[in-house]
């Protein structure tokens, strides 16, 4: 009876469990040495990790010397403690501290590959981050204009504030190409993005496209939404694994980030 109770409390994971249809990895995983209570329990002998629930979040902890048994790849390596799953690959985990920057670079690379596959002669990806105060100020201005019956309030505010709307604007990628007949690109992070899907469909159907500009919200293709980040931060606080910046603040920043995707054929 005690062993059953210990097993239920400690939730050890064994290599055989990985083949079970009932087992799945959590989106957030931890790579850490076995702790004292698991190391000293007979029910955890030969285990490769364990499951736990921190606040409302299920977390799988993997022992470093057993990580290879899970068949995962880690970015940048397996030396970090906390990882979150890549939204495009369930077997690829990204260090939590690197998560948003990694996905930014990966998506810029994908947009470049899409342009090349579609036979673009020129493309540019401009990365923009909206100021935190801009959303609130814009909303107030629009509401104020509506209250006064000014139909053009939105446009006027947008024009006046455009130069100061963003805290960051940078050219993330730009290239001149020879151009060629389109080849259907393999979509990864943008496989559900309606604008990119429309671009591909138009180009493959030989529509006379010449110049297209799209605004792509990064929050649409990220793996951590603000609601997820709140749960992650609560779990990390419970585990006493709080870093310099909260995941919630990063996710909120991500919700203000955009790619302006300009492409010429």
Regions found by a protein language model. Give the residues of each.
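An N-terminally focused, membrane-permeabilizing/fusogenic/translocator signature enriched
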Residues: 1-136, 144
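Polar low-complexity intrinsically disordered regions
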Residues: 1-8, 150-162, 181
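Residue-identity detector for glycine
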Residues: 49, 64, 71, 119-120, ...
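Membrane pore-forming effector domains from diverse proteins
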Residues: 97-135, 156-227, 246-265
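Glycine- and small hydrophobic-rich membrane-insertion segments that are intrinsically disordered
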Residues: 136-159, 226-251
């Amino acid at each position: 009876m005690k062993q059953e109770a210990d097993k239920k409390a400690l939730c050890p994971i064994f290599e055989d469990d990985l083949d079970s249809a009932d087992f799945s990895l959590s989106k957030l995983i931890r790579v850490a040495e076995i702790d004292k209570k698991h190391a000293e329990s007979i029910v955890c002998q030969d285990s490769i990790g364990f499951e736990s629930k921190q606040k409302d979040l299920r977390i799988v902890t993997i022992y470093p010397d057993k990580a290879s048994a899970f068949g995962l790849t880690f970015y940048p390596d397996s030396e970090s403690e906390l990882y979150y799953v890549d939204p495009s690959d369930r077997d690829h985990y990204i260090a939590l501290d690197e998560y948003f920057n990694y996905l930014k670079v990966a998506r810029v690379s994908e947009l470049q590959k899409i342009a090349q596959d579609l036979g673009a002669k020129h493309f540019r990806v401009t990365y923009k981050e909206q100021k935190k105060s801009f959303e609130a100020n814009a909303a107030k201005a629009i509401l104020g204009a509506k209250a006064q019956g000014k139909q053009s309030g939105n446009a006027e505010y947008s024009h006046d504030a455009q130069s100061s709307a963003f805290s960051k604007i940078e050219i993330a990628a730009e290239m001149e190409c020879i151009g060629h007949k389109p080849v259907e690109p393999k979509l990864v992070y943008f496989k559900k993005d309606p604008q990119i899907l429309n671009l591909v469909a138009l180009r493959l159907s030989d529509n006379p496209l010449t110049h297209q500009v799209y605004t792509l919200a990064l929050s649409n293709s990220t793996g951590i939404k603000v609601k997820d980040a709140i749960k992650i931060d609560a779990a990390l606080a419970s585990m006493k694994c709080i870093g310099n910046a909260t995941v919630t603040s990063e996710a909120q920043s991500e919700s203000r980030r955009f790619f302006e995707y300009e492409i010429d054929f």
